[in-house]
From Swiss-Prot:
Protein name: Recombination-associated protein RdgC
Keywords assigned: Cytoplasm, DNA recombination
The keyword Cytoplasm belongs to this UniProt entry's keyword annotation: yes
Organismal lineage: Bacteria, Pseudomonadati, Pseudomonadota, Gammaproteobacteria, Pasteurellales
Function: May be involved in recombination.
Annotated Gene Ontology cellular component terms: bacterial nucleoid; cytoplasm
Source species: Actinobacillus pleuropneumoniae serotype 5b (strain L20)
Pfam family, one: RdgC
PANTHER family: RECOMBINATION-ASSOCIATED PROTEIN RDGC (PTHR38103:SF1)
Length: 302
C-alpha cells in the first residue's frame, strides 16, 4: 500500500465528479510504457495495486492513482567527453572548425549511442482524490513533483482546476503562537524540532533535539522570528513536520494505525490494500479537518 510519506493538499475550484469505468478508460490513454532504446524519459499511470491491470483504485468517491516516471541516467560528463573527442577528430580530419549545428548533431548521435546502455531511474507518485471534500492529496516532497503528476492528471481528464489549499490564518503565525503563547491544541504534541525565520533579515534558525519551550527559543520569537517548520505528533495517529504552506513532510503513521489490519491474511492482497487505503485516508481526512479548524477555515481564492 502506498502509505503517504509527504502530503501536499490541493483544493478543487469547481466541482469534479468521476465514474470508475470512464476514468479507467481515460487513464489507459496515458498509461505508462517503459522507455524504448531511443527514449530519455517516459511518464504515465501505473496500477496502484500490485498484480492488477486497473490504473486506479476506488472506494465510493475516493480515488487513488499512481504516476510512474522513468528517466534514463546519462552522466553529463560522459556525454561531454565523448562529444568533444568526436568533434576533435572530425575537425582535425577536415581541417576546419565545426558549426554549432554540426556539434549538436554529434552530441545527439552520442546520446543515441549511449541510451540503450543507460540505467533507468523510476519514480512513483501517489495521488488521492477525495471527491467528498473536493480535495486532492499528493504524496510528493516538492511542488514540482506534485505539479508534474497533477499536469498528467489534467492531461488525462481534459481539465483539473486545482489550487494549493490555503487558510484564513497563516500557518506560520498559528504555529508561532502555539510555542510563544502555549496555545498548542490538546490533541497535538510538539516534538523537539523546528525552523524559525526572520522575514526582515532572512536569517534562519534550525533546531533539533531542542526544547521548544526553552528561553533560547523564546528569545528568537521575541526577535520577530516566525515558526516555518514544526515537528509534531498526533498521538496514536502519526507524526510529521508541518510546514508554513500547510504541507506535511516525513509523515510516519503510528504502529497502532498500521497494525490495525494485521488480522487480514497476507495472501488477500486486494482486501488488505482496500482496508489500508481506507485507514490512511480516514486518518488524513481527520487531520485535514483539524488543520482547517486550527487555521481558521479554508480561504477561498478568486
Amino acid at each position: 500500500m502506498f502509505w503517504f510519506k509527504n502530503v501536499m493538499i490541493y483544493r478543487l475550484t469547481s466541482p469534479l465528479s468521476l465514474e470508475s469505468h470512464s476514468l479507467e478508460d481515460q487513464l489507459q490513454q496515458t498509461k505508462f510504457t517503459p522507455c524504448s532504446q531511443s527514449d530519455m524519459s517516459k511518464f504515465g499511470w501505473s496500477s496502484p495495486l500490485s498484480g492488477s491491470e486497473l490504473l486506479h483504485f476506488s472506494q465510493s468517491k475516493q480515488f487513488l492513482l499512481v504516476s510512474h516516471k522513468e528517466d534514463k541516467l546519462l552522466p553529463a560528463n560522459v556525454i561531454k567527453k565523448e562529444t568533444e573527442e568526436r568533434i576533435a577528430v572530425l575537425e582535425e580530419k577536415e581541417a576546419r572548425k565545426l558549426k554549432k549545428t554540426e556539434k549538436q548533431a554529434i552530441k545527439d548521435d552520442v546520446v543515441a549511442m549511449l541510451l540503450p546502455r543507460a540505467f533507468s531511474k523510476h519514480q512513483f507518485t501517489a495521488i488521492w482524490l477525495d471527491l467528498d471534500a473536493q480535495l486532492v492529496y499528493v504524496d510528493a516532497g516538492s511542488s514540482k513533483r506534485a505539479e508534474d503528476t497533477l499536469a498528467l492528471l489534467r492531461k488525462t481528464l481534459g481539465s483539473l482546476p486545482v489550487v494549493p489549499i490555503s487558510f484564513a490564518l497563516l500557518p506560520s503565525e498559528v504555529m508561532t503562537n502555539w510555542i510563544a503563547k502555549g496555545h498548542t491544541p490538546n490533541w497535538l504534541n510538539l516534538l523537539e524540532e523546528a525552523e524559525l525565520k526572520s522575514f526582515d533579515t532572512d536569517s534562519v534558525v534550525r533546531c533539533k533535539r531542542q526544547d521548544l519551550e526553552s528561553e533560547e527559543i523564546a528569545q528568537h520569537l521575541q526577535a520577530s522570528k516566525f515558526v516555518t517548520k514544526l515537528a509534531i505528533d498526533w498521538e496514536n495517529h502519526f507524526s510529521c513536520v508541518l510546514n508554513e504552506d500547510a504541507t506535511l513532510s516525513r509523515v510516519k503513521f503510528a504502529d497502532e494505525v498500521r497494525e490495525k489490519n494485521d488480522d487480514i491474511l497476507k495472501e488477500d492482497i486486494a482486501q488488505r490494500f482496500d482496508a489500508d487505503l481506507l485507514l490512511m485516508t480516514e486518518e488524513l481526512k481527520l487531520f485535514t479537518q483539524k488543520m482547517i479548524e486550527e487555521f481558521g477555515g479554508i480561504k477561498e481564492r478568486i
